[in-house]
Amino acid sequence: MKVLICARGYNSYSENKFGSFELDQAKALKAAGCDVRIASLDLRSVKSFRPHGAKLFRSNGMHCATVNSFSSILPQKISGSLGEKAAKAALKWICNDGWKPDVIHAHFTEIADAFAGALGNTDAKFVVTEHSSLMNTQNPDAKTLAQAKNAYLKADKVIAVSRALADNIRSSTGVQPEVVGNVVDTKVFEKLTTGSDSGYFKYVSCGNLVDVKRFDLLMTAFSMTDDKDARLTIFGDGVKKAELTHLCEKLGVKDRVIFKGHQPREVIAKEYAVSDVFVLASRAETFGVSFIEAMCCGLPVITSDCGGPQGFVNELNGVIVENCDAQKLAQAMNRMRLISRSYSSRRIHRFVEDNFSAQAIAKKLIDLYKSL
């Protein structure tokens, strides 16, 4: 089966990168025997300096075409036209040797909208996977909603990466997506946790230091927990770093909260393997890949009722804190400290392997393609 993945591109003079979710799916499908190519659009504004135009290259053993355009900040009519032209150019370049895809699979609203307008009279089935947090609401902004409706209308199948996102898409567009999650690299996160060997209980968290992740709530809850020797390690960086550092001092936990910044997956996986519990109390999560990566290492997790994780967190792998506030989160963290060893790290890891590994997601997608 020939599959064209339509992805977000992030390109400069020195490197070519794709959105990680799209690349992970492309690699999974290729490993499952599909003939996969990638057509990517870099539609960021001129502030993200890079060469304008098209480029052909190979990445991870796949033919790739990238077209750079500048349309993201423009009004819908103008940006839509530019995006469509960029998509047509990408399709022309990626198929310039006569290759014809059986399936064109676009990811994210803006990219899907651009390729929907560029399909022409192709016989290929058109599939859209929605990941965007902008659609994870019952009232998307007008531009995003228009792009989504245009793409979904032309799609043979719409996929959402979580049940919460699917419900919001149905509410705002009337389209009922099928749910297929993102791929998690189970090879990187394969070493199961042995728990902390440092003499104190270790909570760990991961996410961008931005408002929606509510690390201020997590730190406040951490300061309220019973065990004053426990540690909290946080991976990620962002605009709230200085504010959160100051909050640690104010709460009296600066010596027990460790900020690790952005780190490669391999570094994060090593920390998960010597931690006891993963905890993150986001306001909203479209999917929740950080939870899945932690679970892949066998860690039980604590989450707020934030959407995406509610589709996979259950009594066998963690706790969902309903109507989450600092007191309720602290109570959940206290309880988890007492019962964390009762969870089976192997069972938690197996759940991830069965549902979010490259093999599992590739099988779901190929079965879906064949059903169209």
Residue map of PLM features:
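Nucleotide-activated donor-binding/catalytic signature segment of Leloir-type glycosyltransferases, i.e.
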Residues: T245-Q263
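Carbohydrate-associated surface elements
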Residues: A164, V183
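Aromatic "clamp/platform" in nucleotide-sugar-dependent glycosyltransferases that forms part
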Residues: R283
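Short hydrophobic beta-strand element within catalytic cores of glycosyltransferases
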Residues: P300-T303
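Conserved acidic donor-binding segment of nucleotide-sugar-dependent glycosyltransferases
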Residues: E315-A326, R335-R341
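Short alpha-helical donor nucleotide-sugar binding micro-motif in glycosyltransferases
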Residues: H262-Q263, K270-S275
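N-terminal subdomain of nucleotide-sugar transferases
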Residues: M1-H52, Q359, K370
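Conserved donor-binding/catalytic core segment of Leloir-type glycosyltransferases
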Residues: L4, G195-K213, M219-F222, T233
